[in-house]
Amino acid sequence: MKNIEIVKNILSSKKLKKDITFIHIGDIHYNETTSTKKLEYIKYAIEDAHPDYIFITGDLLDRPKITKNKEKIKLLVSWLNSLGNIAKVFISLGNHDIILEEDYKFFNKLNDINNIYVLNNQSYEDKNIFISGFTLPTNYYYNIEKHEDENALLETLQNNFNLVTNLPKKKYKVALIHSPILLSEKKVVEKLKEYDLILSGHMHNGLIPRILDKIIKNNYGLISPDKRFFAKNTRGKIKTKYYIIIITGGITKLSTSSTKILSKLNGLYPISINKITVKGET
């Protein structure tokens, strides 16, 4: 599929004895119109990368009501199962995934699939790596200010102190957090300072067209999901005092929940897949 773009990042860490490869995707916004052919092409691209781990950083669903469409959900579950046959898959939740409390039921069931891990303020670790997934609350995204709320983010981190303090020092640590827009703020950086890498999505690459994406080297976008123009932290790689943030451009740039007319413009934007190689000591 010509419209798939593999974005490569090479990092390094003394905590790893060998190189590891991550595939990082997000913002699939799966709905009634999502093509199974598109999902198959994405699977083939992931398979070709030979990842050790696969990360999906939120908005797997466009609207939770899709879970009532048994035929479409069966196809999605089958696709996730096929990814689990490639490598372990870790999913964090985004604002489109968790509109109602009952929306968690679908994601809880996904944990029954072999090699699928939904990290809802939870963690996973093996001999090489520690992974956590944070779920930002509804009032983080939707509030009277109509912008993302730093206090709600800090409260989430404080309430999940076991995911931000006394983490295994010798393991490479990755956090999955759907929205990156406040992850470079000083108080947030201090809370997350034990991590090496934070993976995010949500920003849809700031809706920067592909040609401008190659020219403009900063992390600003044209517009953010909370309707800010020229918002920061919308794309690319960001270095903070302690960790690196990598933001995926997203599988879908314009979802059907915006408008059906706008969603037809998706063909103008690439399907973004991040391939991240972390070089270890050899």
Language-model-derived ranges and their functions:
Residues 1-33:
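Acidic, histidine-bearing metal-coordination/catalytic regions of metal-dependent phosphoesterases
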Residues 180-272:
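Conserved beta-sheet core of the metallophosphoesterase superfamily
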Residues 24-39, 61-72, 98-102, 139-151, ...:
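Acidic/histidine-rich helix-loop elements
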Residues 24-26, 53-59, 88-95, 117-121, ...:
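Active-site neighborhood of phospho(di)ester-bond hydrolases with catalytic His/Asp-centered motifs
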Residues 34-126:
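Core catalytic region of metal-dependent phosphoesterases/phosphodiesterases
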Residues 113-114, 127-177, 183-190, 258-270:
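Binuclear metal-dependent hydrolase catalytic cores centered on His/Asp/Glu-rich metal-binding motifs
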Residues 49, 80-86, 167-169, 188-194, ...:
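Short, conserved loop/helix-junction motifs that constitute active-site signature segments
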Residues 12-23, 123-136, 168-174, 239-245, ...:
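Beta-strand-turn-beta hairpins that frame and shape the catalytic cleft
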